[in-house]
């Protein structure tokens, strides 16, 4: 897609498709503008291009822009670190039209578990009009810990992305994490 006619901007907020992502990233890189993206289903080459772009622009990519999910990432990483040897399973449920399975959020929760030393297994359910539910289970003989987040309204994702865009504007080039930007935020 040709985006050269797009007016000037401080931050691009992109929740499009993997096929449109390259043009948005190139526009931001060329203009030296920040990018907030929640586009999932990106290829390894697209993730590599995004990593290369952080040398010249600030980028925040997240699979989910909910403040609750940002906190859940931290809790999952900490639980994995504190519970070595426990099984880690991630169960995610979304509406029937969601195409990627496991979801980008489930995969990044798995990355958080891996940072803490756990290897996650995934189960995906597509049913009805569910906005998004993620449960991370840590289990061992005789006990289970379950960390869960349920989104009941899609507005939370837009609010989180706009908040992230305001905080990312003017930041130095680099890959920024949602949870770092939200750290000082109080609802």
Task: Label the predicted regions.
Residues 1-9, 84-187:
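C-terminal substrate-binding/catalytic lobe of Rossmann-fold NAD(P)-dependent oxidoreductases
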Residues 1-30:
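N-terminal glycine-/serine-/threonine-rich beta1-alpha1-beta2 phosphate-ribose binding loop
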Residues 17, 39-40, 65, 95, ...:
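Short loop or secondary-structure boundary microenvironments that flank
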Residues 19-31, 38-61, 67-79:
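Rossmann-fold NAD(P)-binding glycine/threonine-rich loop
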Residues 32-33, 172:
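Residue-level recognition of short, well-ordered coil/turn positions
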